Regions:
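A cross-kingdom feature marking solvent-exposed beta-strand/loop segments within repeated
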Residues: 23-70, 75, 80-88, 178-212, ...
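Short, structured motif recognition centered on aromatic/hydrophobic residues
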Residues: 13-16, 38, 53, 57-62, ...
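Active-site neighborhood of HAD-like aspartate-dependent phosphohydrolases
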Residues: 1, 92-141
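Conserved acidic, metal-coordinating active-site core of Asp-based
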Residues: 123, 139-141, 152-161, 169
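Residues at the starts of beta-strands that form the adenosine-phosphate
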Residues: 10, 78, 161
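A structural feature that tracks compact, well-ordered secondary-structure segments
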Residues: 18, 63-71, 101-114, 167, ...
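Eukaryotic modular interaction domains in large regulatory/scaffold proteins
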Residues: 148, 163-166, 170-192
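Single conserved hydrophobic/aromatic residue that forms the stacking wall/gate
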Residues: 2-8, 12
Length: 237
């Protein structure tokens, strides 16, 4: 399990494992072998790791363990369940690229719930009617805010690029743009896919990671870029 925090202009990566302290030497040797710059470790011996996230100032928690990810989400942290793939991904040199879905990821699930319960037409009507009302923050909003700050701090280096890849169309996308303005956040690229498949666009963007709330999008995307599913909070949908 990997978490990261943004300190100053540096991104700190930490390993959080359910292994015991007795197994730590093998983990340390593996990190050295793969030349991974991870200095701080938590070996919880099987205990829930989410309780320690605040102590380490974590901005993002990633794991293949859905229960740990759900616990982190409920505790108020940006978190995603990574899809384990054997794919050898290709990444842009000297730049980190992070892509997000919109509803139930960057923004709350309020609009997604309308779509799930009442259909696309009701969703479109609601978003156009409320285009001047900013969407509520979702589980990844705090991460995007931190990334936006980091971009501003390192803008001369051009080491970070962000994108939104959403199933919304251009008309319902107006609310997305206005919400980002209200948050004083600039995203480099936005793709309003109108329900089209996201994987090809993500491959062209060259995402180092993509966050989506639905397996129907995150699953296929994980074949071309590292992807993580963001679970809903209990009772949210």
């Amino acid at each position: 399990e990997i978490s990261c925090s943004l300190v100053g202009s540096e991104m700190c990566i930490r390993d959080r494992s359910r292994n015991s302290a007795d197994t730590s030497l093998r983990i340390i040797h593996s990190l050295e072998y793969y030349d991974m710059d991870i200095g701080r470790m938590v070996l919880s011996g099987g205990e829930d790791i989410s309780r320690y996230l605040s102590a380490f100032g974590v901005d993002l928690f990633l794991s293949c363990n859905e229960n740990d990810v759900s616990n982190a989400i409920h505790a108020g942290f940006a978190a995603g369940m990574i899809y384990a793939r054997d794919t050898k991904y290709s990444f842009p040199d000297n730049q980190i690229r992070i892509a997000f879905d919109a509803d139930a990821v960057l923004f709350s699930a309020e609009s997604e719930k309308i779509y799930q319960e009442h259909g696309l037409e009701a969703f479109n009507e609601n978003e156009i009617l409320n285009q001047d009302v900013a969407l509520q923050k979702g589980p990844m909003a705090s991460l995007l805010k931190s990334l936006s700050w980091l971009q501003n701090e390192t803008k001369d280096l051009n080491v970070l690029r962000t994108a939104i890849v959403t199933a919304r169309n251009k008309d319902t996308g107006v609310r997305v743009i206005k919400t980002l303005r209200a948050w004083n956040i600039v995203v480099d690229e936005v793709f309003f896919m109108q329900g089209a498949k996201k994987a090809d666009v993500l491959a062209c963007f060259g995402a180092n990671i993509f966050f989506d709330d639905q397996d129907v999008h995150a699953g296929p995307a994980s074949d071309v870029v590292p992807s993580a599913r963001v679970p809903y909070k209990e009772g949210e949908m």
